Amino acid sequence: GYLIGGIPTNFKSSARLPKETKKNVPSFFVIEADEYDTAFFDKRSKFIHYHPRTLVLNNLEFDHADIFDDLDHIKKHFHHLIRIIPQEGQIISNAESNALRETIDMGTWSEIEYFSDEKGWSYEINKGWHSLSISYKNKNQGMLNWNLIGHHNASNALAAIAAAKHVGITPENAIEALSLFKGVKKRMEKIASYENGINLYDDFAHHPTAIMTTLAGIKKTEHEGRIIAVIEPRSNTMKLGSMKKELINSLK
């Protein structure tokens, strides 16, 4: 089963209960979690309550200014999460995030794999974002041909393949499944295309880094013409004005 913060276009909803399995065969549940607090009476991050066996860490930056004082405050909560991963579990982390590396260095019980890293899981662009060569420790694992674009989606693919491998799915089968993945609504979703060459995308990016990454992906796909970005700062962090400078820089 799964519970995520968006609606996959391959499925009808953002959540599904696990199907019944044979006796002694474990069922799996995938949950998208973040560091926001649990409730007004429990200021621990929500993900502390999930007790994962396989943990994917995509990124760690300052966010949720209404809850956290600074980046170190968030690192503390991520450290609590990392410490509850069992010894037989696995942490799959983004090698490009220094903050994640620093948090992992605080101590962990479990095995660690990195993606977006030549020493771990990596990709090479073959013919644009739609064709990626997937490698693990410099050994080719297969070619991913899909409809998604952008470095963030490619990194997510690496993390998904690594997580699938940890629960017993071969990289070959994971890559084949990803080739059928159509993306998530409001995540770089192309909602209109006009005869004059104008394409219209809808994206949920609400953090300056996410906005910058989204625009970078579009720039590599839409090679001609202007890019016009319309931003609605709706998150609490953005409404508090905590990232005015970062927001301006993300649009350059």
Explain the meaning of each model-derived region:
Residues 5, 94, 117, 232-234:
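Cofactor-binding loop segments of dinucleotide-utilizing enzymes, especially the Rossmann-like FAD-
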Residues 1-9:
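Short beta-strand-centered segment that lines the nucleotide-binding/catalytic pocket of NTP-utilizing
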Residues 10-12, 16-26, 30, 37, ...:
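Acidic, Mg2+-coordinating active-site environments of NTP-dependent enzymes
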Residues 37-51, 208-220:
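Switch II of P-loop NTPase G domains
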Residues 184, 209, 216-252:
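Active-site beta-alpha connecting loops in nucleotide-dependent enzymes
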Residues 13-15, 103, 212, 239-242:
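Short, well-ordered secondary-structure micro-motifs
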Residues 40-43, 66-72, 238-241:
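Glycine/threonine-rich flexible loop motifs
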